[in-house]
């Protein structure tokens, strides 16, 4: 059954001519071995992993569960992550942003408990490293966009043409057979009330209390909010629109009371 999505990132010198390592974020269906998402990035952030969730879920639907390691992006560990949480994150929630998205989607998270348990997802990385590095060397690739093009080509070849050594099937056809036979645990994604938009789900979150001037603040940024009174608890859903601007959706008592835009630099938000 299609019940588990293996999700991870790998930091590697994908294109030696670039003389810098990049992150590769992937999502892989455990049953069919079909690679659902693959993106090269210069920086690994919570938002990058949320974008991976959004892309995968809006394209393929909701899986039963995600399988990840204990990286701080996926799981808060008291002691290990306390300093990071207090000084370097957008919010002061102990539940990581990525985890909160899956909670809203009603998708279970399974954490790897040992290096051996991660063997499934590390095997595709070894294969990708071999293929992509060789191609990037042969074509003298030094730009991440060129490397992404090569990655996309390799993923298509793997998904649609390569017979997997374990399943003895091409991933795409194994995936389609399960969908046709109704043995898939993927569910259609729908925005659940009270939320109204995918921007309310695939986003960053921030909780604040309204002051006597009907404002909320974060560091140096002060925002006046419509539809609230002093003492109200506001949940701000932050949806980065691009590398400069984000949309802020203010929720209070399960109602969308205001929508504003703010500069990412004022939010101290880096998404690249």
Per-range role (PLM):
Residues 36-37, 258:
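A structural microfeature
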Residues 1-35, 42-53, 58-64, 99-104:
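Mobile-element integrase/transposase regions
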Residues 37-43, 84-88:
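The substrate-binding groove and active-site-proximal loops of carbohydrate-active enzymes
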Residues 8, 33, 66-69, 118, ...:
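Short, conserved catalytic/metal-binding motifs centered on acidic residues
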Residues 91, 97-190:
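Charged alpha-helix within mobile-element recombinases
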Residues 10, 30, 40-43, 69-71, ...:
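An acidic- and aromatic-residue-enriched active-site/binding cleft used to recognize and process polar
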Residues 155, 159-272:
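C-terminal, beta-rich DNA-binding module of retroviral/retroelements integrases
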Residues 58-90, 113-115:
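Acidic/histidine-rich, metal-coordinating catalytic segments
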